[in-house]
Amino acid sequence: MDKKYKLWNYKYDFSEINLKNWKEVLKDTFKLNTRKIALLSMLFAIEILMTIISKVIMGLAIPMIVGVYTIEISFFVILIIYLCSNYIYASILSITAIWFRLLLGSEPVGLLSMMISDTAFLTIFAVLFFILKKFIFLKFKFKNQIKILIALICFAGLISMIGSGFISMLCNDKFIFEMYYLSDDGSGYWKMLLWVGFGVTLAKYSINILLFASTLKVLLILIKQSRV
């Protein structure tokens, strides 16, 4: 079969899947080789490093907001892992990195909340980005593909952060705050906490999407050259 790769010059992107090539697409997407394992290991190490930086340096620069929320800058590495591999591998490494924070003194309830938020964002982002690539990026020819990809990433990121924000609000309202022994006394503090959390979620993912988008051009070159 004459292969015509549309995004990468050496493999299928998952968004290129159809009834004829699905076996090859799944193989290209999920098969682990020495290069891919080495790359994922390196990126996971960078994620852990960024986690430590977020925990120590950012924790000192930006203390807990209203005693509950923090802003982390390590999630963009998970998006890089997603771009280099797939949603499943990115999710596994994301959850592993989140619970690694226990060794840095983070408390479990906050990590549970972070896991819900990050997993929700990554899931929505992966679905939206797949749809946008399949029905826009791969359907039409663009002079500047990098700019189009960045625009699609920003759009998918915007929808994902809003979705993740509302999911986090719902979880906070239903059980997360109760695990902090907080209660709604009718004073308005409960609702204020919920909306502050929504704002913090938007701020966190906005920063990480910008970091991810700013590195996209270099990432695409490195991925194509490394052929992972």
Curated annotation (Swiss-Prot):
Subcellular compartments? Cell membrane
Q: What is the induction note for this entry?
A: Expression is probably regulated by riboflavin, via an FMN riboswitch.
Q: Which domain of life is it from?
A: Bacteria
Keywords (A to Z) from UniProt: Cell membrane, Membrane, Transmembrane, Transmembrane helix, Transport
In terms of InterPro entries, this protein maps to: Riboflavin_Transporter_RibV (IPR053647)
Q: How does it sit in the membrane?
A: Multi-pass membrane protein
Membrane-spanning ranges: 37-57, 61-81, 87-107, 111-131, 148-168, 192-212
Q: Which residues form the signal peptide?
A: none
Gene Ontology CC: one annotated term: plasma membrane
What this protein is reported to do is described as: Probably transports riboflavin.
Q: What is this protein called?
A: Putative riboflavin transporter RibV
Name the species this protein comes from: Mesoplasma florum (strain ATCC 33453 / NBRC 100688 / NCTC 11704 / L1) (Acholeplasma florum)
Organism lineage string: Bacteria, Bacillati, Mycoplasmatota, Mollicutes, Entomoplasmatales
